[in-house]
Amino acid sequence: MQAILNFIVDILSQPAILVALIAFIGLIVQKKPAATITSGTIKTILGFLILSAGADVVVRSLEPFGKIFQHAFGVQGIVPNNEAIVSLALKDFGTTAALIMVCGMIVNILIARFTNLKYIFLTGHHTFYMAAFLAIILTVSHIKGWLTIVIGALVLGLIMAVLPALLQPTMRKITGNDQVALGHFGSISYFAAGAVGQLFKGKSKSTEEIKFPKGLSFLRESTISISITMALLYFIACLFAGVSYIHESISDSQNFIVFSLIQGVTFAAGVFIILTGVRLILAEIVPAFKGISEKLVPNSKPALDCPIVFPYAQNAVLIGFFVSFITGVIGMFILFLFGGAVILPGVVAHFFLGATAAVFGNARGGIKGAVAGAALNGVLITFLPLLFLPFLGELGGAATTFSDTDFLTVGIVFGNAVKYMGLFGAILFIIIVGATAILLKGRQKPQQ
């Protein structure tokens, strides 16, 4: 039984396989020729593997930056990282998390089939992280046994339907259509970025309309501007950390200037690969998903990972990362001055959430909206972990925590509910999220 469960989880937690399976079913339902089904399925897998490869390149290029930064400023503290905290949690909560994930995805599909929230959440690894997260919260709050699975699955299925719905009005502005949704557990940041961006509506041009002097026109190409910006960030960080430290501990004796340049261009290459993968996914999943939306789950939409929005505002991606990270650094020093736990800037989280928040802010309020939205994200992912740490139980001392805002906000609200009210608090939370779903019903119709 455990082997079967592990096999199912392995499939569902791999976005490439999960989305390819959806594309495969969609093409079969449309009665496409075998050649089209094979091509569409393989291209969907290929698109996600390309996206994942790009994300890995970005993450690997950022890892040395985090080490350099910590050494440069001599700060020790908690580094938010989803993968790290989940890997620790699986030792004690693995089976429970797997069952919550499988049952939660079923709940999500049932909600999409029988309600007006037509979003099928396809970011498999994030679904698994949230399942592990819920297993921790419920167990620490002494809700155990089958109740953990039932409550966890209901909460997971509901938020996988509600959060994409919350973002869809701005997603329509970003993409110019209503064919795809965003399925990523940084939704609170993105919604907040869109809301703060709305304050600058009509007051600022889009990030994609930035005009460069003729001599700097090459910076209009995002890959080049990202390369230069990241190389400069690395160069400055290396100077603060000390050349000897870079040579001995980071660059394997490579000159720190050359090292900075290579890391900056590597980061840009990762972003370029991500964008290539996104374009391939969109070209395949949207037509294939028509079979699902027309026959099996009428009018449903795929909710996909956050890089899906990067091609629509590539300048905002760079602005968002930079602003969110700088905000996180400022927040770190504020926490350091006040004593207590210090949240170090998680570079990966600041990139993916900050970039996406800036895209949402830009859609509503142009450049000012992008900057404000990314800064707000930086504040949220720096200070919210402090409120969330008590709900991790014994894992709270692991020097890491969840990094994305939905984990943190759901953890704080849901964690307090079950901590002080037990099972009743969990049920009350489910009712409130369900009521939110009803209120969101009117937001799902495209504006004329």
Language-model features, listed with the residues they occupy:
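C-terminal halves and exits of single transmembrane alpha-helices
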Residues: 79-99, 298-322, 393-401
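Membrane helical hairpin/interfacial module
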Residues: 47-98
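C-terminal TM-helix exit segments that contain a strictly Trp-centered aromatic cap at the helix terminus
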Residues: 55-64, 381-393
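Hydrophobic alpha-helical bundle architecture
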Residues: 113-117, 306-386, 390
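Membrane-interface interhelical connector segments
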Residues: 63-81, 289-310
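Membrane-helix interface and helix-disruption motif detector
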Residues: 88-95, 119-121, 141-149, 219, ...
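Signature of multi-pass transmembrane helix bundles
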Residues: 1-54, 99, 103, 107-289, ...
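Mid-membrane cores of alpha-helical transmembrane segments in multi-pass membrane proteins
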Residues: 73-79, 97-105, 125-132, 153-157, ...
